[in-house]
Design a protein with these regions (language model features):
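Primarily recognizes Gram-negative and organellar outer-membrane beta-barrels
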Residues: 1-228
Length: 228
């Protein structure tokens, strides 16, 4: 602008707007069967599904580019480009599990089980560009991306519980095998596969000190896996 705020070299307006959505879908089914001879002996079958789809649709637009006579030069020199981004992501997980518990005598309990988890992370982001002031959007490969990340997780666990007077002792372990598949459909990045396993020990100890007093301690470990 000039000193009188009336003359100017160039000017333009920008408009940024968009909309998005986020959902959480969860469900589970359990079936449990108890032994007629011993009510503490039971087997449980479980299924669980979780899904978290998200969308994002945004625009950045240049408007009222002036002076009109120099409009194209302004667009070229300042690299003014409208863009439209249309993105979708989702993390979906299905879990199948079976658990078995049985007492051995009055003091001992054995727990064992197995689990299969199928986890699918996906991201699809389409990017479009148009010359400033134009709505002729063209899909741009260089700035778009599409990505898939699959995990197949198989695990088994075993645990033992000893209850004697005011003492409760629970050691156990869990073994997990993960098969990972990553694929870049659009955008930079190389597809890769990975397999790895983990052995996770756990232990807890509880002591009853009185009618309202308990002392507890333990060790456990959780495994965190990448999402989107």
């Amino acid at each position: 602008y000039g000193s009188d705020h009336q003359s100017f070299a160039y000017r333009y307006n920008t408009d940024n707007h968009g909309k998005g959505s986020w959902y959480s879908i969860n469900g589970n089914v359990d079936y449990q069967r108890t032994s007629k001879k011993n009510k503490e002996r039971m087997i449980t079958f479980s299924y669980k599904i979780n899904s978290h789809p998200q969308t994002n649709d945004s625009y950045n637009t240049y408007l009222n580019i002036e002076p009109e006579a120099d409009r194209q030069d302004i667009i070229d020199n300042l690299l003014l480009k409208n863009f439209h981004s249309d993105g979708k992501t989702n993390t979906m997980e299905q879990t199948f599990q079976v658990d078995f518990t049985t007492p051995i005598g009055k003091l001992h309990t054995i727990e064992t089980g197995a689990k299969y988890i199928f986890r699918r992370n996906s991201s699809d982001n389409k990017f479009y560009e148009a010359e400033g002031g134009s709505e002729d959007y063209v899909y741009t490969d260089d700035r778009s991306s599409e990505y898939r990340h699959l995990n197949h997780i198989i695990s088994a666990y075993a645990g033992y519980t000893l209850k004697y007077k005011g003492l409760t002792f629970k050691p156990g372990f869990r073994y997990e095998q993960t098969v990972q598949r990553v694929k870049y459909i659009v955008g930079p990045g190389e597809d890769f596969n990975a397999n790895f396993s983990d052995l996770v020990p756990s232990v807890s100890l509880g002591i009853k000190l009185g009618k309202t007093q308990n002392l507890r301690g333990g060790y456990n470990m959780r495994i965190w896996r990448p999402g989107i």
